[in-house]
Amino acid sequence: MLTAHKITVLINIFFIFSNYNNIKAHLVSYPSLTSLYGTSLKYFSVGILFTSNPIIFIIFVYSIRESFYSIFSSLVSGMLSIIISEAILFITYFWGILHFSLSPYPLYNEGIILTSSRMLILTITFILASASCMTACLQFLIEKGMSLEISSIVFIIYLLGECFASLQTTEYLHLGYCINDAISGTLFYCVTGLHFSHVIVGLLLLLIYFIRIVEMYDTNSEWSYSLYGISYIVLPHTDQITILYWHFVEIVWLFIEYFFYSE
């Protein structure tokens, strides 16, 4: 006797064989004239299977290990997960940029004239490079023990971030196209706007970091001690997530500069 499950299976088999000639055995790939032909959707799917899944598994195992053997593991592992997820989000946008810029049709930047000044972009890049150097110094001082000058370094990094936000806003005000002007304008505003929001979050983290350091010095809490007449503060390991997040923002900007501003 035919049951409902058997009837459903027979119907599916009937539709499969009736449309056998119309079934495609491959995914739609890029045109052969583009440089993305070697990484078409078929091979990209295989790449996801052998790259993303093992990475997610390694992160999962690492989080379990850190939850048992590390004191501040939950916050650090959570921050690493956030950074990795944001990196994957930016990768999807960069993939879209490559897709439309290397495809022969439609034109990627039809009717778009980039009006950003080269000096403005170089200034923005120089500011973030300076912030990266200061962040490296901050990381070194955290590992060795923080002196009284560390609060000034954090404040300088915060000021550099404010300068970046001001220059980015100036660029937006002088652009000659909008977000709905072709796919180029859409991707430009989406990617740079998303990065701008990450910079704002990084500035908030730096501001909180600076306030915590000042309060620790003012209250002379148990975090501070003196050695050979020099005052130090030992901060918990969780404060390094701010530095890690700021480095991530700087690296993303280098990719943005390459995709949008390089010739």
UniProtKB/Swiss-Prot annotation:
<keyword id="KW-1133">Transmembrane helix</keyword>
<comment type="similarity">
    <text>Belongs to the cytochrome c oxidase subunit 3 family.</text>
</comment>
<dbReference type="GO" id="GO:0005743">
    <property type="term" value="C:mitochondrial inner membrane"/>
</dbReference>
<feature type="transmembrane region" description="Helical">
    <location>
        <begin position="145"/>
        <end position="165"/>
    </location>
</feature>
<dbReference type="InterPro" id="IPR013833">
    <property type="entry name" value="Cyt_c_oxidase_su3_a-hlx"/>
</dbReference>
<feature type="transmembrane region" description="Helical">
    <location>
        <begin position="120"/>
        <end position="140"/>
    </location>
</feature>
<comment type="function">
    <text>Component of the cytochrome c oxidase, the last enzyme in the mitochondrial electron transport chain which drives oxidative phosphorylation. The respiratory chain contains 3 multisubunit complexes succinate dehydrogenase (complex II, CII), ubiquinol-cytochrome c oxidoreductase (cytochrome b-c1 complex, complex III, CIII) and cytochrome c oxidase (complex IV, CIV), that cooperate to transfer electrons derived from NADH and succinate to molecular oxygen, creating an electrochemical gradient over the inner membrane that drives transmembrane transport and the ATP synthase.</text>
</comment>
<keyword id="KW-1278">Translocase</keyword>
<comment type="subunit">
    <text>Component of the cytochrome c oxidase (complex IV, CIV), a multisubunit enzyme composed of a catalytic core of 3 subunits and several supernumerary subunits. The complex exists as a monomer or a dimer and forms supercomplexes (SCs) in the inner mitochondrial membrane with ubiquinol-cytochrome c oxidoreductase (cytochrome b-c1 complex, complex III, CIII).</text>
</comment>
<feature type="transmembrane region" description="Helical">
    <location>
        <begin position="44"/>
        <end position="64"/>
    </location>
</feature>
<dbReference type="InterPro" id="IPR024791">
    <property type="entry name" value="Cyt_c/ubiquinol_Oxase_su3"/>
</dbReference>
<dbReference type="Pfam" id="PF00510">
    <property type="entry name" value="COX3"/>
</dbReference>
<keyword id="KW-0496">Mitochondrion</keyword>
<feature type="transmembrane region" description="Helical">
    <location>
        <begin position="191"/>
        <end position="211"/>
    </location>
</feature>
<dbReference type="InterPro" id="IPR035973">
    <property type="entry name" value="Cyt_c_oxidase_su3-like_sf"/>
</dbReference>
<dbReference type="InterPro" id="IPR000298">
    <property type="entry name" value="Cyt_c_oxidase-like_su3"/>
</dbReference>
<feature type="transmembrane region" description="Helical">
    <location>
        <begin position="241"/>
        <end position="261"/>
    </location>
</feature>
<keyword id="KW-0999">Mitochondrion inner membrane</keyword>
<dbReference type="GO" id="GO:0004129">
    <property type="term" value="F:cytochrome-c oxidase activity"/>
</dbReference>
<dbReference type="GO" id="GO:0006123">
    <property type="term" value="P:mitochondrial electron transport, cytochrome c to oxygen"/>
</dbReference>
<keyword id="KW-0812">Transmembrane</keyword>
<protein>
    <recommendedName>
        <fullName>Cytochrome c oxidase subunit 3</fullName>
        <ecNumber>7.1.1.9</ecNumber>
    </recommendedName>
</protein>
<feature type="transmembrane region" description="Helical">
    <location>
        <begin position="7"/>
        <end position="27"/>
    </location>
</feature>
<keyword id="KW-0472">Membrane</keyword>
<feature type="transmembrane region" description="Helical">
    <location>
        <begin position="78"/>
        <end position="98"/>
    </location>
</feature>
